[in-house]
A protein has these predicted regions:
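Short, hydrophobic/amphipathic alpha-helical patches that form generic packing surfaces
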Residues: 72-82, 141, 145, 247, ...
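Short His/Asp/Glu-rich catalytic/ion-coordination signatures at enzyme active sites or charged loops
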Residues: 16-31, 80-99, 122-164, 223-263, ...
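N-terminal helix-rich structural modules
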Residues: 3-201, 206, 221, 634
Length: 686
C-alpha cells in the first residue's frame, strides 16, 4: 500500500491549488485505490482512538470526533464518485466494481462497531443534561439514528445478514447504472436520406451530421441523449422514425444482452425490502420515510392522490385536444401514441400560442444564459462570480469560478459542465467536491466546492450553444441546488448545505425555476445571438401564456413515477413477477396515453434504483408544493426583493440540515405550506 507521504499520489497532503481545489490535472486512475485504502485505514485509526479514549464519552470526544473522522476518505470518494458520473471510462468502472463493495464493508464496520455505538449511545442517553446548542443536538440525534438505522442494534446472524445485503446492494446499484450508460451510448439511429429529416430544425440536423462525422460515418446520427432524442421526438415529421427512436429509448436495458436490468430491478427492490425488514420496518418505504418531511407512506399517497384528483380532468382534456388536432391531419381513426405526443403537443402549442422552443432558442445562447443566471444570484444575494483558469478541471469543457459574497469575502468554488459526452451519464445534477464546515481548532470557515453538471445542446461548427427554454429551466434548477451548497454556514460537515431531508432538498432548486418566465429576469440576458435584439415582449407574453400548456399531463407523468416508486418500495414480500406488467399496474391510474406493452421505465429508472430517490420520487411534487408557496412571497413583495431573498438565504439556504425543515420553512414563510399556491400557479384552481 502507498504510504500517506508518497509524493506520487496527489490525494495525499495538501493540493497546493487555488482554494485547495481538486488537482484533476495530476490525478490518474491508479491513484484512487491506494488513497481510498489509506483513507479507510486512517478513519479506522481515528475510530479506534475514540473507542480507546479513557475519558467518559462526551459530545466532544465522541460525537464531534466521529463527525470529523474520515477526511481523506471523503475527499477521495467525492472525486471518484463524481468522475464515475461525469467523466467515466472502462478502467474507472472496473475499479468501481472493486471499490464500492469495499466502501460498503467499511461503512458497515463503522455502524456495526459495538464499542463505538456504546459510546454514542452513552452520550445520547444523557442528551437532556448536556446543554447542547441546536446544531449539536441535531448532530447527536443524526449520529445516534444513523447507527440504529444501519444495523447497530442487530446481533449475531442478523448483523452478518445486514452486512451481506448492503454489500450486495452496492454492487447491484452500480451495475444498474453502468448498464444504463452503456445501453444509452450503444444506440445510434443513422439516417442517410435527406427526406428522413423532414420537420427537424437546422441546428438539430447540424448536430446529427457532426455526431455521424465524428465517428467517420456519412449521414445524420441521432442518439438517446436528451439534446438529440427530445428534438427528434418533437419535430420529426416521420412517424415511423419517431416510433423507432421512442422504442429504442423506452426499452433500454430490457434486451437480451449483457445490459439487461430486469433481474437487477427485482434484486434491488427485494434486497432493500430485506434490509428494511431486518431493521424492524414493514417495508423499505417505511424505513426511508422515517427521515423525511412526509414521515410515512400514507402522507405520500395522500399527496399523490390529491394531485391526481386535481389534475386528471384537465389532463384528459389536454389529451382530447391533441387527439383532435392529430385527427384533423391524419383522419378520424388516428390514435395519438406516446411517440406522437411531443410532436402534436408542439404543433398545438404553436397553433394556440404561436410559440415553440425553436423560436426562443436563438435568444438563449449559453454564455448569455450563464450571465443571466449568475446575474440573478447577484441581484438576489449580492454574490459575484469570477472565472479562474488556474483552478484545475477534469475536462476541457469544464469551467471553474470563484464565488465572492457581497462583502467581497471568498464564498465558494463553482464548476460548470454543460454538454453531453460518452463518459457522462444522462440528466442534470449538482454535486459537491468539498462540503462547508467550521474548523474547531482555528475557527476558520472552510468553504465549499460544488459543481453543476448538465447535458445541454452542444455548439456546432456554425452556431454557438443555443439552449431550449427547458434547458434554461434546468440550468436554474441545478444552480438553485448549488446556491444551497455555496451558502452553507454550519459548524459540522454532515449538517451543511444540501445535507437535508430528501423531500426538502428540491425546494432551493425548484424555486429558481419560477424566474424562467419572469419578464424582469429574462430582460437581463435574453438577446438574439446574431442581432443582439432583446427577447421581444410579445414572445415573453406568449411564453407566459403557454407556461401551463399540458401542465396537467406533465403532473400526471410525475405522479405516475411517484406511484411506480412507491409500488416497488411498499412491498413486504419478495417480487418474482413480470416487471413490465407490475409497472403498468402500479401507475395505471395516472396514465393518459395508450400503453406500449414493450416499454419499460423501471429498467432505466436510475433515480430510484441507483440514485437517492428510492421511496423518494414523490419529493419532486412535495417540493413543488413548497416552492409554489414560497415563491408566492417573492411575487407578493417583488421578485428581486432583498428582504425576502435575505430571509430565504438566512432561514433556508445557509441552514442546511441544522434544524427540522418544517421549522426552517415556517420561519421563512410565516406559515405551513399550502397546496393551493401550486394549483393556482398551474391554473387548476382559480
Amino acid at each position: 500500500m502507498n504510504n500517506i507521504t508518497n509524493a506520487q499520489n496527489p490525494f495525499y497532503g495538501q493540493y497546493h491549488t487555488p482554494h485547495e481545489t481538486v488537482p484533476f490535472d495530476r490525478i490518474e486512475t491508479e491513484h484512487y485505490e491506494p488513497a481510498i485504502l489509506e483513507g479507510i485505514r486512517l478513519q479506522n485509526a481515528e475510530i479506534e482512538a475514540i473507542i480507546q479514549n479513557p475519558e467518559k464519552a462526551d459530545f466532544t470526544n465522541t460525537i464531534e470526533a466521529f463527525d470529523e473522522s474520515g477526511e481523506l476518505l471523503d475527499r477521495v470518494v467525492a472525486v471518484f464518485g463524481n468522475m464515475l458520473s461525469a467523466e467515466t471510462n472502462d478502467d474507472l468502472q472496473e475499479l468501481a466494481q472493486k471499490i464500492m463493495p469495499l466502501l460498503s464493508e467499511h461503512s458497515n464496520n463503522i455502524t456495526l462497531n459495538e464499542k463505538l455505538f456504546a459510546r454514542v449511545k452513552e452520550v445520547y442517553n444523557q442528551k437532556e443534561a448536556l446543554q447542547l446548542t441546536q446544531e449539536q443536538k441535531q448532530l447527536l440525534e443524526n449520529a445516534y439514528n444513523s447507527f440504529v438505522r444501519h444495523g447497530a442494534n442487530l446481533e449475531g446472524e442478523a448483523r452478518e445478514e445486514y452486512r451481506r445485503l448492503t454489500t450486495e446492494l452496492s454492487k447491484l446499484t452500480l451495475t444498474f447504472s453502468e448498464n444504463n450508460l452503456k445501453e444509452t451510448n450503444a444506440y445510434q439511429m443513422l439516417l442517410t436520406k435527406k427526406e428522413s429529416l423532414a420537420g427537424l430544425p437546422e441546428i438539430i440536423i447540424e448536430a446529427a451530421a457532426e455526431t455521424a462525422k465524428s465517428e467517420g460515418k456519412e449521414g445524420w446520427a441521432f442518439t438517446l441523449h436528451a439534446p438529440s432524442y427530445i428534438p427528434f421526438m418533437t419535430y420529426s415529421d416521420n412517424r415511423d422514425l419517431r416510433q423507432k427512436l421512442y422504442m429504442a429509448y423506452n426499452t433500454k436495458c430490457t434486451h437480451d444482452n449483457e445490459f439487461n436490468n430486469i433481474d437487477i430491478v427485482k434484486k434491488i427492490a427485494n434486497t432493500r425490502m430485506k434490509i428494511a425488514q431486518l431493521l424492524g420496518y414493514k417495508d423499505y418505504a417505511e424505513y426511508t420515510l422515517k427521515k423525511r418531511m412526509a414521515e410515512n407512506s400514507e402522507s405520500v399517497y395522500k399527496l399523490l392522490n390529491q394531485l391526481l384528483e386535481a389534475y386528471a380532468p384537465t389532463a384528459q382534456q389536454e389529451y382530447k385536444e391533441i387527439q383532435e388536432l392529430a385527427r384533423e391531419e391524419q383522419g378520424d381513426d388516428f390514435v395519438v401514441m406516446p411517440w406522437d405526443w411531443s410532436y402534436y403537443s408542439n404543433k398545438l402549442k404553436d397553433k394556440k400560442f404561436n410559440i415553440n422552443e425553436e423560436m426562443l432558442r436563438p435568444y438563449f445562447e449559453l454564455e448569455q444564459v450563464k450571465k443571466g443566471v449568475f446575474g440573478l444570484a447577484e441581484k438576489l444575494y449580492g454574490i459575484t462570480f469570477r472565472k479562474n483558469t488556474e483552478i484545475p478541471v477534469y475536462h476541457k469543457e469544464v469551467e471553474a469560478f470563484e464565488v465572492f459574497d457581497k462583502d467581497g469575502k471568498f464564498l465558494a468554488v463553482l464548476y460548470t459542465d454543460f454538454h453531453p459526452r460518452p463518459g457522462k451519464r444522462a440528466g442534470a445534477w449538482m454535486t459537491s467536491y468539498k462540503d462547508q464546515w467550521i474548523d474547531k481548532k482555528t475557527g476558520e470557515n472552510s468553504r465549499p466546492h460544488v459543481s453543476v453538471v448538465m447535458n445541454f445542446t452542444k455548439p456546432t461548427e456554425n452556431k454557438p450553444a443555443l439552449l431550449t427554454f427547458n434547458e434554461v429551466e434546468t440550468f436554474l434548477h441545478e444552480f438553485g441546488h448549488s446556491l444551497h451548497g455555496m451558502f452553507a454556514n454550519s459548524t459540522y460537515r454532515s449538517l451543511s448545505g444540501t445535507n437535508v431531508y430528501w423531500d426538502f432538498v428540491e425546494l432551493p432548486s425548484q424555486i429558481m425555476e419560477n424566474f424562467a418566465i419572469e419578464k424582469d429576469f429574462l430582460n437581463t440576458f435574453a438577446r438574439h445571438y446574431q442581432t443582439g435584439e432583446v427577447l421581444p415582449d410579445e414572445l415573453i407574453r406568449r411564453l407566459v401564456d403557454a407556461s401551463n400548456f399540458n401542465i396537467a399531463y406533465a403532473c400526471l407523468r410525475q405522479i405516475s413515477f411517484g406511484l411506480l416508486d412507491m409500488a416497488w418500495y411498499t412491498r413486504n414480500t419478495p417480487f418474482e413477477g413480470d416487471v413490465k406488467a407490475y409497472e403498468q399496474e402500479a401507475w395505471k391510474d395516472a396514465q393518459i396515453l395508450p400503453v406500449v406493452q414493450e416499454a419499460c421505465m423501471s429498467t432505466q429508472f436510475s433515480h430510484i434504483f441507483a440514485g437517492g430517490y428510492a421511496a423518494g420520487y414523490y419529493s419532486y411534487k412535495w417540493a413543488e408544493v413548497l416552492d409554489a408557496d414560497a415563491f408566492s412571497l417573492f411575487k407578493q413583495k417583488g421578485i428581486f426583493n432583498q428582504e425576502v431573498a435575505d430571509s430565504f438565504r438566512n432561514n433556508i439556504l445557509s441552514k442546511g440540515g441544522t434544524e427540522h425543515p418544517m421549522i426552517l420553512y415556517k420561519r421563512f414563510r410565516g406559515q405551513e405550506p399550502s397546496i393551493d399556491a401550486l394549483l393556482i400557479r398551474n391554473g387548476i384552481k382559480k
